[in-house]
């Protein structure tokens, strides 16, 4: 299916959770446009723009847009210090001033509870987007911050359950955090691991965290470096993947693949480090398993991961 962006073009695209609609950021219009799936007379389907675009609210270039997996709200972020939370009909629910001098990245957590941003300051700020039992929006409140970097933060990412976060900074380090904390009781996230990534000192970086939080991918320029977060060690390095700088990096929802975007192309990589991480985890759990049923279940997972590595020619003896 194709959708025409009349008298403009899109710079960012995000699908709704059910994939029956998507939003785009208009390059010339400087606002959001919604496209919904509609049925044609011949029985096929197409995407049609809604009658009205969202109102213009941002005063600086946009850096990211996102739709919550619950479908309850949309986030837009600009390069000044502004994050906007919208309902699906184009009404601003909340305006967030990040106080980070400028934003470099912003995102919604996979659980849809949080929005977060990073920028010129050496931290990542996270807010909770609160809804009532009936699904009505209530407020946006501060949740927690990731503190410890000594320079601006380029990018961050959540694990699929939002219990882990990773960040990469201009100080030349990446960090893995335990964010499964009682933030309403003022409990701060725990630092689990720190690793060196010197390229971050001189170049803008993109970061992706696997759904289970066990693999971290970092992109700078046209190269990708992949780390095991349990050990903090680099496992893979893909040089000159694209002819131009990589603009985005993401794991698929299963964690089996890593995708990179650049020079008008998307490239897919098998997540062999992810399978190795599962092998390490299952071997450790097997040593501590106390009953046979648990051992059988763990052995099955171990075997599947080993078979996946063997099929990729990546099984280390």
List each language-model region with its residue ranges.
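Structured C-terminal portions of repeat-based eukaryotic scaffold domains
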Residues: 186-198, 205-208, 214-245, 250-252, ...
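Canonical WD40 repeat/beta-propeller blade segments in eukaryotic WD-repeat proteins
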Residues: 7-15, 59-67, 101-108, 151-157, ...
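WD40-repeat beta-propellers
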Residues: 32-38, 83-87, 124-129, 174-179, ...
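Terminal intrinsically disordered, low-complexity extensions flanking WD-repeat/beta-propeller proteins
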Residues: 236-237, 244-245, 252-257, 263-317
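Conserved strand-to-loop turn within each blade of WD40 beta-propeller repeats
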Residues: 25-28, 77-80, 118-121, 168-171, ...
